[in-house]
Amino acid sequence: MKQKLIKKAQELRQHGFTTGEIADELNVSMDTARWLTLQKPAEEKPEAPVDFFINWKSLGGNSTRLRYVSGALSDMALSHGEAEVILGIAVSGIPFATMMADFLEDMSGVETSLAVYHPHKHRKEKDDGEGAISTNFGSVEGKKVVIVDDVITSGKTVKEVIHAVKDHGGEPIAVTVLIDKSGLSEIEEVPIESLIKVGRL
């Protein structure tokens, strides 16, 4: 399994993916993605960072399954109030957020917009720019916002998004994720809801 991950990470790097994009694609932390891309087959390898590879392709490749999971995430989000904006973290949070906006509008009767956030980790490593809320989707200004992603590993990206939402005048009321590898119950006083929590014994 490890050799397959190393090969996949290196193939993604050759196709121009940044470390952040590789981390998202393989559902591993940035440290693990960096380690995977630096491996050389014939040399002695440093010890790998502790992480878990999450493969949810059987879910991500099926719209019916995505809809069911998005319904469950929507139900969890409702326990924190009525959201006016569902913000998906690019890339893998967007499909969930899109379906959740539809579900939550039907469930709560409150008009619910979709917003998209492009995190800093998707930028080229040499770029010191910040992540950004896309202007092609809904605005978070003056709105109650639920943040959505597929996997939370360290919480760094979610913390970045929470700050961006607040900086744009929004109020983050919850973070919903498919899989939580962080073990955190909240970030910046915003509760985290997950369908699955992963931890080491």
UniProtKB/Swiss-Prot annotation:
One annotated GO molecular function: DNA binding
GO cellular component, one term: cytoplasm
Gene3D superfamilies, per database record: 3.40.50.2020
Transmembrane regions: none
One BP term from GO: pyrimidine ribonucleoside biosynthetic process
InterPro entries assigned: GfcR-like (IPR022854), PRibTrfase_dom (IPR000836), PRTase-like (IPR029057)
Domain of life: Archaea
NCBIfam families referenced in this protein's UniProt entry, alphabetically: PRK02277.1
Stated name of the protein: Transcriptional regulator GfcR
Organism annotation: Methanobrevibacter smithii (strain ATCC 35061 / DSM 861 / OCM 144 / PS)
Gene name in the database record: gfcR
